[in-house]
């Protein structure tokens, strides 16, 4: 059990969880508001 908690508190697992969470937020935002992420610069 101690090894499992050490693995779950390691940096790569936290980075992957954060990236997955951020990607999910971006995907859902893009699903509801598809035009807001791609503003023309003109």
UniProtKB/Swiss-Prot annotation:
GO BP annotations, alphabetical order = photosynthesis
Cite the InterPro entries for this sequence.
PSI_PsaJ, PSI_PsaJ_sf
Localisation per UniProt entry: Cellular thylakoid membrane
Keyword hit for tRNA processing:
no
Lipid bilayer topology: Single-pass membrane protein
Its transmembrane ranges are 7-27
| UniProt keyword rRNA-binding, yes or no | no
Q: What is its main location?
A: membrane
The entry's keywords: Membrane, Photosynthesis, Photosystem I, Thylakoid, Transmembrane, Transmembrane helix
Gene Ontology CC: photosystem I; plasma membrane-derived thylakoid membrane
Q: Which domain of life is it from?
A: Bacteria
The family annotation for this protein states: Belongs to the PsaJ family.
Q: What does this protein do?
A: May help in the organization of the PsaE and PsaF subunits.
Specify the protein name: Photosystem I reaction center subunit IX
Q: Which species is this UniProt entry from?
A: Microcystis aeruginosa (strain NIES-843 / IAM M-2473)
Give the encoding gene's name.
psaJ
């Amino acid at each position: 059990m101690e090894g499992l908690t050490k693995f779950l508190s390691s940096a790569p697992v936290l980075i992957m969880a954060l990236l997955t969470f951020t990607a999910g937020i971006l995907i859902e935002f893009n699903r509801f508001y598809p035009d807001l992420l791609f503003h023309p610069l003109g």
